């Protein structure tokens, strides 16, 4: 429920990630500052501006948006230097972020990004008016200071310069249009917001709370997925880590484009399927969106799955061999590379280990490749078959040479009471226990650390 220990943790995460953008700071400090200045700076402008309005009006009730045009209506009230200074400081803080955001579109590498997101029309409109809101506010408040005095170190200084160098008639003529420009930019932004990337402002915060309350996306599409797709800010941080982009130049299938297309209901199979599911983008995502799960359940929904009875034939089949509490599952990749299987036979024999061979003479795949293709129901049949086989032979340790099998055994098989090891981990244990003797030689070996093993 909401009144739980997770609630204060969720509140702190909202402050840390939605306002201060800690994860983006880890990617690049300048990029983190840019996002923080826009989010946290605007938030403080709202809060401090509201406090200023309440203080000016004698602590009467004022709605939170009551400060937006306060400087337009409150030109004759006495100025309070503390608020003038704070509001100017916060406005400068936000303007520095706007400047960096504009610079990022020109030279993104200065902020550690080789590629940036290609935005759709709705994003471009919202982005353009967002960049104009705060310069328009600066000009509107400065011209007010020029005509009525007051202001802080920023608006007051600019206003004083205007008063000395611009004809008063021109100032009077521009006064209303500048406030209208600020108003129009602000209004256009909120009109465009639901149709743009900036919808994440209103979905990221509830997503954090729901995630803290243990709600997650699953292998099947669900209503919770909408929170995740809308919470993507399309920051583009997921683009550079993608190997399809960096090594092959494929630049239209990354998670930012997958989520965008899924949100607008024009997701193509080529975008959903053309992904290695390595998880690099998910690891870098500052919002913590479950990118692999969403892509997987999209594949499941879009796939034209054949007859679901086609895997029922292997129920009850047992082609395993041997006895022992240590089981060895070769997996498809090992069976396609017989030298690995022969090497493991020699290692088991040298260590004196009695082994149960799950699929030495052929068996059922671990199910992960089928699941990654979108056939989650068929993959579950394979997994259930293997689980029953492991339980039947009462193994306590399961060794595999295939990193793909290792990953799915550990993450999706729920093999309580069975220890799952990669053969490299198992060999290290044999060496430490003195059951496998090594001899120094002159040979040089190269070891490849697979992505799935990492």
Question: What are these model-predicted stretches?
Answer:
Residues 1-223, 239, 299-302:
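Membrane-embedded alpha-helical bundles of multi-pass integral membrane proteins
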Residues 18, 22, 209-212, 245, ...:
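A short secondary-structure junction motif
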Residues 28, 263, 374-375:
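Short, solvent-exposed helix-helix connector turns and helix-capping sites enriched
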Residues 142, 149-152, 201-202, 209, ...:
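Flexible loop/turn segments at secondary-structure boundaries
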Residues 162-170, 218-220, 283-284, 291-454:
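Iron-sulfur cluster-binding electron-transfer modules in prokaryotic oxidoreductases
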Residues 212-229, 237-284, 288-316, 378-381:
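Ferredoxin-type iron-sulfur electron-transfer modules in oxidoreductases and energy-metabolism complexes
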């Amino acid at each position: 429920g909401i009144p739980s220990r997770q609630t204060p943790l969720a509140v702190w995460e909202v402050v840390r990630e939605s306002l201060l953008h800690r994860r983006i700071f880890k990617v690049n400090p300048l990029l983190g500052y840019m996002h923080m200045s826009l989010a946290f700076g605007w938030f403080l402008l709202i809060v401090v501006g509201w406090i200023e309005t309440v203080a000016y009006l004698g602590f009467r009730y004022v709605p939170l948006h009551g400060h937006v045009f306060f400087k337009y209506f409150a030109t004759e009230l006495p100025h309070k230097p503390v608020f003038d200074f704070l509001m100017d400081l916060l406005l400068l803080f936000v303007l520095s972020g706007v400047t960096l955001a504009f610079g990022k579109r020109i030279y993104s590498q200065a902020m550690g990004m080789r590629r940036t997101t290609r935005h759709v029309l709705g994003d471009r409109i919202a982005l353009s008016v967002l960049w104009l809101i705060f310069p328009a506010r600066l000009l509107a408040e400065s011209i007010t200071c020029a005509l009525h005095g007051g202001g802080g170190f920023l608006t007051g200084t600019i206003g004083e310069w205007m008063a000395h160098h611009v004809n008063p008639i021109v100032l009077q003529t521009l006064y209303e249009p500048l406030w209208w420009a600020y108003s129009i930019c602000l209004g256009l932004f909120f009109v465009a917001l639901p149709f743009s990337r900036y919808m994440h402002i209103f979905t990221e915060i509830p997503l954090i709370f729901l995630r803290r309350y243990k709600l997650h996306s699953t292998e099947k599409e669900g209503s919770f997925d909408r929170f995740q797709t809308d919470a993507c800010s399309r920051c583009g941080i997921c683009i550079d880590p993608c190997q399809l982009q960096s090594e092959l130049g494929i630049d239209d299938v990354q998670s930012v484009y997958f989520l965008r297309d899924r949100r607008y209901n024009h997701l193509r199979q080529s975008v959903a399927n053309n992904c290695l599911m390595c998880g690099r983008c998910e690891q870098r995502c500052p919002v913590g969106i479950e990118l692999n799960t969403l892509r997987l359940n999209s594949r499941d929904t879009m796939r034209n799955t054949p007859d679901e009875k086609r895997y029922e034939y292997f129920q009850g089949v047992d082609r395993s061999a041997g006895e022992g509490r240590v089981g060895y599952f070769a997996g498809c990749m090992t069976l396609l590379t017989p030298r690995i299987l022969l090497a493991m036979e020699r290692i088991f024999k040298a260590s004196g280990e009695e082994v149960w061979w799950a699929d030495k003479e052929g068996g059922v795949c671990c199910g992960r490749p089928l699941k990654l293709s979108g056939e989650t129901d068929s993959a579950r049949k394979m997994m259930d078959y293997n689980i029953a086989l492991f339980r039947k032979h009462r193994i306590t340790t399961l060794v595999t040479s295939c990193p793909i099998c290792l990953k799915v055994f550990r993450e999706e098989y729920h093999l309580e009471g069975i220890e799952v090891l990669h053969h490299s981990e198992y060999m290290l244990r044999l060496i430490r226990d003195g059951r496998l003797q090594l001899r120094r030689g002159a040979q040089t070996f190269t070891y490849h650390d697979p992505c799935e093993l990492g």
